[in-house]
From Swiss-Prot:
Catalytic activity reported: L-seryl-[protein] + ATP = 3-O-(5'-adenylyl)-L-seryl-[protein] + diphosphate; L-threonyl-[protein] + ATP = 3-O-(5'-adenylyl)-L-threonyl-[protein] + diphosphate; L-tyrosyl-[protein] + ATP = O-(5'-adenylyl)-L-tyrosyl-[protein] + diphosphate; L-histidyl-[protein] + UTP = N(tele)-(5'-uridylyl)-L-histidyl-[protein] + diphosphate
Primary enzyme class: transferase
Chain's role: Nucleotidyltransferase involved in the post-translational modification of proteins. It can catalyze the addition of adenosine monophosphate (AMP) or uridine monophosphate (UMP) to a protein, resulting in modifications known as AMPylation and UMPylation.
Protein name, per record: Protein nucleotidyltransferase YdiU
Length: 487
């Protein structure tokens, strides 16, 4: 079994130099203990699940001793926050420890969130709190299990170090993994500070490391933008299809790799409400669920602006026109699968929109609807689901059309269709009230609920007998929890 001290670090981003990041030593937290660890994330580094019991893991994540081979750096970047440019950003509470190469040749950034003050902390203390660390851990691993591209979370470490937010809380750290931590905001930082040579160096670095196919294109920089756009469209299609609301889609929270990244006040839809706002600091609803696609387009235009020293503006505008068609095509295919279709018909989009309108009008639970649609033969499932709708005439019309649509699939094996639907429609979804209950237990020192919740959410499509309580409809109080950016 590989030991933590034997990880193969190769810190290429650190070698870019002090223009791009600053060397910082993690500040230790007091009396650290492991809250939860992900066996799946450990495996990405060729580590066995038993490594979670190694005291050295807590020591490294608590900043109590240096990780052999790591070169902790705070990355420099800026970004647009709620539509306004902020030049004073950067890693204010987290450090890129380094890059590890696993046995498959894959590179994984190790990023320690809550590592203490950095040159970019501004007025902050550089710490993360336990509740936000648990929320990111649970969401990262759950999104991965759902098939949604995301950063990963290896473990959460709690402590007795006090920190002040709205009230006194306890500091924690999160060890995050991602193929890269480069954000849209990295490019904006060098563009708006007019460091164009550094901008070129960053472009060459990310293309060489992550988009090598672009080097064969006539304009590698535009090709890079196209790849980022394509990945972002694919990501947004999955967010919208599975009812995920990020909550704070600032450009500094947008990954060049099209992965879910730096999410704090996130939520999955309970009742279907396209105008849902999960971040109670978002007074204008800029990052509401139904605004995520246009915001992603806006953020891509901000990235494109940062590339204008090297890419023709008209070419970038031409690329941006591809975003919505790419998103719509990917989203439509995902929704077809969720409804059990294997073929495509021209009016499928309209069919799906009619369903969503009916769900909105009746406040139907978004995730449970699709799961229950595959629980029984189609006609029986629709009879049960009819009970959840207010507009019965509208639902009956849609249900009749849906049965006719399924009949045109010419699929004789009903069981195969239902199994296929269960493979894409989760029984278990990370609801805010479940996360809150686990967090409250953890704050009392009981980590078993968060560990059990993580285990259940890591297999969201499986029945998991005995765990049905995690699949229940949320209580009314659980639908209205306010989540803030405070972390």
């Amino acid at each position: 079994m590989k030991r933590l001290s034997e990880l193969a670090f190769d810190n290429r981003f650190a070698r870019l130099g002090d223009t791009f990041s600053t060397a910082v030593t993690p500040l230790p937290i007091a009396s650290p203990r492991l809250v939860v660890a992900s066996p799946a994330a450990l495996a990405l580094l060729d580590l066995e699940p038993a490594v979670a019991d190694d005291p050295q893991l807590v020591e490294y994540c608590a900043g109590q001793c240096p990780w052999p081979g790591a070169e902790p750096r705070a990355m420099a970047y800026s970004g647009h926050q709620f539509g306004f440019y902020n030049p004073q950003l950067g890693d204010g509470r987290g450090l890129l420890l380094g890059e590890v190469i696993n046995a498959a040749g894959e590179r994984w950034d190790l990023h320690l969130k809550g590592a203490g003050k950095t040159p970019y902390s501004r007025m902050g203390d550089g710490r993360a709190v336990l509740r936000s660390s648990i929320r990111e851990f649970l969401a990262s691993e759950h999104l991965h299990a759902l098939g949604i591209p995301t950063s990963r979370a290896l473990c959460v470490t709690a402590s007795d170090t006090p920190v002040w937010r709205e009230t006194e809380e306890r500091a924690a750290t999160l060890l995050r993994l991602a193929p890269s931590h480069v954000r849209f905001g990295h490019f904006e930082f060098f563009y708006y500070s007019r460091q164009h040579e550094a901008l070129r160096q960053l472009l060459d670095y990310v293309i060489g490391e992550y988009f090598a196919d672009c080097l064969a294109q006539p304009d590698p920089y535009r090709a890079f933008f196209d790849r980022v756009l394509e990945r972002t469209a694919a990501l947004l299609a999955r967010w919208q299809a599975y009812g995920f609301c990020h909550g704070v889609m600032n450009t500094d929270n947008m990954s060049i790799l099209g992965i879910t990244f730096d999410f704090g006040p996130y939520a999955f839809l309970d009742d279907f409400d396209p105008g849902f706002v999960c971040n109670h600091s978002d007074d204008t609803g800029r990052y509401s669920f139904d605004n995520q696609v246009p915001i992603a387009h806006w953020n891509l235009s901000a990235l494109g602006q940062a590339l204008t020293p090297f890419v023709d503006k008209d070419a970038l505008l031409g690329s941006l026109k591809r975003f919505l068609p790419l998103f719509r095509g990917a989203w439509l295919e995902l929704m077809r699968r969720r409804l059990g279709f294997t073929t495509a018909e021209a009016d499928d989009r309209e069919r799906i929109q009619r369903l969503l309108q009916l769900m909105q009008g009746s406040a139907v639970d978004y995730s449970r609807f699709f799961r229950e649609l595959g629980d029984r033969p189609a006609a029986a499932a629709l009879r049960r689901l009819r009970e959840d709708f207010v507009d019965l005439a509208g639902f009956d019309a849609w249900a009749g059309d849906h049965l006719a649509r399924l009949a045109r699939e010419n699929e004789a094996d009903e069981a195969a269709r239902r199994a296929r639907m269960h493979a894409v429609n989760p029984k278990y979804i990370l609801r805010n009230y479940l996360a809150q209950q686990a967090i409250e237990a953890a704050e009392r020192g009981d980590y078993s609920p968060v560990r059990e919740l993580h285990a259940v959410l890591s297999r969201p499509f499986d029945e998991q007998p005995g765990m049905e309580r995690y699949a229940e409809r949320p209580p009314e109080w659980g639908k209205h929890l306010e989540i803030s950016c405070s972390s």
